[in-house]
């Protein structure tokens, strides 16, 4: 279970993400240039804020209702304070995200018994796993204009979690040793 210490809470949490390729998936945001991912993130966060009642209450839906495309009449208990509000995330999220999540959840349910359940809430939105702005780097992992700068990990836009950030950081450290 999810807990800040003993991991013995009645609650559990996990993050399921979909890939968004800022160059291919966001043509509507092209006029923002390198900040298009940041603008898209702002729009997603605004959508969640509005759907939650313009407060810190998070919009949510039972997992089965999300996959089936129907509004949840009630939600499961949550450890998130200040709470959840039932919202049609299946139709609120851009189809780029919603359709990918729905098909992914359905596939998980086929492969892991008990995964596709009404006992789970889908809570929106966790709007990023890495930086919405990618700091450029060359084939040697160094910034193309600033010698000695090796953008890496989540902050540089090259990783989406602890393991991938560690792996990218290791690659950048090795590149720095060779390059410096």
Explain the meaning of each model-derived region.
Residues 1-88:
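An anion/pyrophosphate-binding glycine-rich loop and adjacent beta-alpha core
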Residues 5, 24-26, 76, 147-148, ...:
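Glycine- and aromatic-enriched mobile tails/lids
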Residues 68-72, 127-130, 138-140, 163, ...:
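Short capping/connector residues at structural and topological boundaries
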Residues 84-159:
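A glycine-rich dinucleotide-binding beta-alpha-beta segment and adjacent secondary-structure elements
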Residues 153-179:
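A conserved FAD-binding loop/helix module that cradles the flavin
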Residues 67, 71, 105-116, 173-180:
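Structural signal for hydrophobic packing residues in well-ordered secondary-structure cores
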